[in-house]
């Protein structure tokens, strides 16, 4: 069953609605402003239900949301060197919003700043959201139609399906930017997360947090999560990559990528105090692991104060700066070649 209610009004004057999807041992709240995940309620071992998603109580706080809590990011997630992408011999320019580089397309006018059109699918317990960009809008070519479909399945799996169609060649790499704390969104560092990542390689970054182009083995580094290990020690490791980002803000190269055709488990997360667990699946080649290294919001939901490390984001996407790295899996889409990315969240308690 899907319920909807008025959540407020966007700066453009368009009404914003909040939608609730329920399933076995899960309740998901989303809104059409930014196709944003607002909250996910799941139980711990004794059955105590908590919201495990960081965010705000009020719509107005999402208008100034530099952390991009819960947002659908696009058309290009993550960082692009020089804020420029070359497509078919033409240079296309996005805003230089992080020094000379681009982060998340356009932090002021990106997809997370729009009110999306909505279609409810009661049969599949899904909310389908759609928005469009004209040719050249946000600095990239193509008349583009973007979709984000949010589904809670009969087995309690939360699925997000991203898609894009364009009438000319363009570059697309969408993701969802939800932050989690499996001990509860306001638990802060009073938690103990352990990770497993199906990733034998990661992408080192330079002093501007742009991938160097190397696809490096994780063995012997803080990025080796091939076996269950706590994330907190790695966030403060004496490692130049960790120091550069103040924690983890790196792309893990998920094993078994087959050009978006295979959904596979990328990450497994356990919170030891509550017994909540998360299996994270995707069809994307990489997952940006971000450990909230720059969080610091005093206006969060339930009067929470999210500081450094208060939550982690798993961002399934094309590798950062792919247009400048020919050895990376590429993300050019166009007529007859639509973009798609599937993300699934499987919550458990053990």
What are these regions (language model features)?
Residues 1-350:
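An exposed, glycine/acidic-rich loop-and-rim segment of catalytic or binding clefts
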